[in-house]
């Protein structure tokens, strides 16, 4: 009795403590729920948007829960340092810088005024791109670049059956070569078409003035429903300028060079001379892991080769796709990197046959079709790949990557991510599919086949018995109007063999077992 009285006396204190706990719980729940409501209302997102509006966008954003859109930019400064590079200031002034850290270059100018006095000049014919010393003096440094430039303009004009019209040059002014672009009866029109096409190949898409009348056919609307792509054929060269002048100049950072033209140099026949002389400088890329160890399980671009990314690694799954099809610009770059190890070892044997083998191998590593396709896309003012920036989808949870795709360029700038949104969403879905497929195959490999069969048949048995359970079968007979006769078992006549139910003829019915 005393314990009961003591309990009732302490009840107010217990109630006060319980009430305090309840108040704390209610306050916490209300605060948390209020924060969730603010987040779902979009107020915080609006403040973030207003704060960041107008600022530069990051090229790394989330797609779904674990996938991120990222990019890597390759630094070609060291990769192409030994080869000539080109750039354009405007439609009339174009520059070609010499290899390495040279201070000289070649200036290509389109003008309507001649710089050479015809009476004091000598005429040089088809052998100008073989022996330029007949035209100018003291150009040992410029000779390689000049040969490449002329070879590209003439489109391998030295082949049998090809002829070029004469050009003008003047020794007294150093390196000075002048082309007369005026169409005359003396100048074969096919030759000028080839020269103008070579200029378009060198100078890029912004110089579409090189092409006049074209037969346009097979026009189709693109997937973005904003552009129409047409196949052009039988284009005739055309330009409003009368003269093309090539002369030497000092290099003062005239403009930003385009290394896509330099890659064309490496792929061209005249470029083999550069590769032969500078092979060791050309193959200076390395493969390593994040700690600098040689050749890891996957591919890593070292810090000097990547802009703003430090060391960037890609897993073996993404790289294995490069062995399936030769249709990726990123894979072409990796083939050059991977070739580095054996090439440097082979350079210990300096025989001419070995060098020829190496140069031919380099030429086969990069896809000619891809390179030409991107150059043609540039000429037609269609977004093209310049082999510099590549985008990919990164799974932040598992560290998996998609095969990097080239970030296309249009009008001198990279496309906005929204222009190829369908592509990176498709890549994200493909990465999910690959991961699920690999996980399924991995689980299949760890599971015995007999266990799978047992699981299948047991599941089938369970489903069958489930229907039987729902339907139910009658288990015994009842006398209509009377109680359960169990444990006696009645016959169809309503009697039991033990004699307890001995009067036959009573009506019976089947009854299910009680559950």
From Swiss-Prot:
Gene Ontology BP annotations = fusion of virus membrane with host endosome membrane; receptor-mediated endocytosis of virus by host cell; virion attachment to host cell
What keywords does the record list, in alphabetical order? Disulfide bond, Fusion of virus membrane with host endosomal membrane, Fusion of virus membrane with host membrane, Glycoprotein, Host cell membrane, Host endoplasmic reticulum, Host Golgi apparatus, Host membrane, Host-virus interaction, Lipoprotein, Membrane, Metal-binding, Myristate, Transmembrane, Transmembrane helix, Viral attachment to host cell, Viral envelope protein, Viral penetration into host cytoplasm, Virion, Virus endocytosis by host, Virus entry into host cell, Zinc
Family annotation (InterPro entries): Arena_glycoprot, Arena_glycoprot_zinc-bd
Entry similarity comment: Belongs to the arenaviridae GPC protein family.
User: Which gene is annotated as encoding this protein in its UniProt record?
Assistant: GPC
Superkingdom of the organism of origin: Viruses
Q: Name one GO cellular component term.
A: host cell endoplasmic reticulum membrane
Name of this chain's protein: Pre-glycoprotein polyprotein GP complex
Q: Which cysteines are joined by disulfide bonds?
A: 87-255, 300-313, 322-331, 385-406
Per the UniProt topology annotation, the Extracellular ranges are 2-17, 59-453
Write down the glycosylated positions. Answer: 90, 112, 127, 180, 248, 386, 394, 416
Q: Is Disulfide bond one of the keywords UniProt gives this record?
A: yes
| Positions with a binding annotation for Zn(2+) 2 | 476, 478, 484
N-myristoyl glycine: lipidated where?
A: 2
An MF annotation (GO) of this entry: metal ion binding
Enumerate the transmembrane spans: 18-33, 454-474
Q: Where is this site: Important for GP-C-mediated membrane fusion?
A: 33
């Amino acid at each position: 009795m005393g314990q009961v009285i003591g309990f009732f006396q302490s009840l107010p204190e217990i109630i006060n403590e319980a009430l305090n706990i309840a108040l704390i719980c209610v306050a916490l729940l209300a605060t948390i729920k209020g924060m969730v409501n603010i987040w779902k209302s979009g107020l915080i997102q609006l403040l973030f948007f207003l704060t960041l509006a107008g600022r530069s966008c990051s090229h790394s954003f989330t797609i779904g829960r674990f996938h991120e859109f990222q990019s890597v930019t390759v630094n070609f400064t060291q990769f192409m340092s030994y080869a000539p590079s080109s750039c354009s200031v405007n439609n009339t002034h174009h520059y070609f810088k010499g290899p390495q850290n040279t201070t000289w270059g070649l200036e290509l100018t389109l003008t309507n005024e001649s710089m050479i006095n015809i009476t004091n000049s000598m005429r040089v014919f088809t052998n100008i791109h073989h022996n330029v010393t007949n035209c100018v003096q003291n150009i040992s440094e410029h000779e390689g670049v000049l040969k490449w430039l002329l070879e590209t303009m003439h489109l391998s004009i030295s082949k049998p059956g090809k002829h070029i019209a004469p050009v003008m040059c003047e020794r007294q002014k150093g390196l000075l070569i002048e082309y007369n672009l005026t169409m005359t009866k003396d100048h074969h029109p096919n030759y000028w078409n080839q020269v103008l096409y070579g200029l378009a190949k060198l100078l890029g898409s912004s110089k579409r003035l090189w092409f006049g009348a074209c037969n346009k056919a097979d026009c189709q609307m693109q997937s973005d429903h904003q552009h129409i792509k047409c196949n052009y054929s039988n284009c005739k060269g055309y330009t409003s300028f009368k003269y093309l002048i090539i002369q030497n100049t000092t290099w003062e950072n005239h403009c930003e060079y385009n290394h896509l033209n330099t890659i064309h140099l490496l792929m061209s026949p005249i470029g083999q001379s550069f590769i032969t002389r500078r092979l060791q400088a050309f193959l200076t890329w390395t493969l390593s892991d994040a700690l600098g160890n040689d050749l890891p399980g996957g591919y890593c671009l070292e810090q000097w080769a990547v802009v703003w990314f430090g060391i960037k690694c890609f897993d073996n799954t993404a790289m294995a796709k490069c062995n399936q099809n030769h249709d990726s610009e990123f894979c072409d770059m990796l083939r050059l990197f991977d070739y580095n190890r054996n090439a440097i070892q082979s350079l210990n044997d300096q025989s001419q046959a070995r060098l020829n083998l190496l140069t031919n191998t380099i030429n086969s590593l990069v896809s000619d079709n891809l390179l030409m396709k991107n150059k043609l896309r540039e000429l037609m003012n269609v977004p093209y790949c310049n082999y510099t920036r590549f985008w990919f989808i990164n799974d932040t949870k598992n560290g998996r990557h998609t095969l990097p795709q080239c970030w296309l360029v249009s009008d001198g700038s990279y496309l906005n991510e929204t222009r190829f949104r369908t592509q990176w969403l498709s890549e994200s879905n493909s990465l999910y599919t690959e991961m699920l497929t690999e996980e399924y195959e991995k689980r299949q490999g760890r599971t015995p086949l007999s266990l799978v069969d047992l699981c299948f048949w047991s599941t089938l048995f369970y489903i069958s018995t489930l229907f039987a359970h729902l339907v139910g079968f009658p288990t015994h007979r009842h006398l209509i109007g009377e109680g359960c006769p169990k444990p006696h078992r009645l016959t169809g006549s309503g009697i039991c063999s033990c004699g307890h139910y001995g009067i036959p003829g009573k009506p019976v019915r089947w009854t299910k077992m009680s559950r």
